[in-house]
C-alpha cells in the first residue's frame, strides 16, 4: 500500500515573518558595514599574495591568523593549503584543533571558497596589485575575504548555533 500524500510532505519549522527576516537581514548588513574597511584590507592583503595550485603557504597562514584573531578553531589539510574553521556546536568541542566528531557537530552547514590564483601577470595598476607574476584574476581573494566576513558574523551568533546543535564549517 502506498503512503498517503500527506505522509510524503516534509515537516518544516515555522517560517519567520517577512518583517522578521528583513530585520535579521538589515542587522547583518549593518554589522558587515561596520567592518567594511577591514574586509577591504583583507581582500587587498590576499590580492597581493597570489599563490598557485595547492601550494598556498602565505595565503593559508593569513587565513589562519585571521581565524585565530576571531578565536575560531581550525584544521589544515592538503599540506596546509586547505583551512577549515568551525563555528557553533562543533567548535565548542574541538578544543582548539578544529576537529570534531559528527555527533559533536550536530547539523552541519558548509561554506567554501577557493584561495589559489592564476599564472597571469597583473597589469591593473592598483596600489594592491600583485607583483609575482600571478594574480587573483578569478576572484579567489574575494572568496576568501567573503568567508572571513561570514566567519566573523557567525562567530557573533555562535551561541545560537550551539543552542540549535549546529556547526558551520568554513
Give the location of each predicted region:
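Acidic/His- and Gly-rich active-site-bordering loop/insert found
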Residues: 2-136, 141, 145-168
Amino acid at each position: 500500500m502506498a503512503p498517503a500524500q500527506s505522509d510524503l510532505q516534509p515537516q518544516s519549522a515555522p517560517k519567520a515573518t517577512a518583517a522578521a527576516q528583513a530585520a535579521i537581514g538589515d542587522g547583518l548588513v549593518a554589522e558587515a558595514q561596520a567592518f567594511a574597511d577591514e574586509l577591504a584590507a583583507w581582500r587587498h592583503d590576499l590580492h597581493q599574495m597570489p599563490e598557485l595550485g595547492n601550494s598556498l603557504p602565505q595565503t593559508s597562514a593569513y587565513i589562519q591568523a585571521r581565524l585565530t584573531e576571531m578565536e575560531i578553531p581550525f584544521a589544515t589539510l592538503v599540506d596546509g593549503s586547505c583551512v577549515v574553521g568551525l563555528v557553533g556546536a562543533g567548535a565548542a568541542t574541538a578544543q582548539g584543533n578544529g576537529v570534531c566528531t559528527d555527533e559533536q557537530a550536530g547539523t552541519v552547514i558548509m561554506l567554501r571558497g577557493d584561495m589559489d590564483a592564476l599564472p597571469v601577470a597583473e597589469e591593473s595598476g592598483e596600489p594592491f596589485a600583485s607583483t609575482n607574476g600571478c594574480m587573483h584574476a578569478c576572484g579567489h581573494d574575494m572568496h576568501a575575504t567573503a568567508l572571513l566576513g561570514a566567519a566573523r558574523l557567525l562567530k557573533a551568533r555562535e551561541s545560537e548555533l550551539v543552542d540549535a546543535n549546529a556547526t558551520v564549517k568554513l
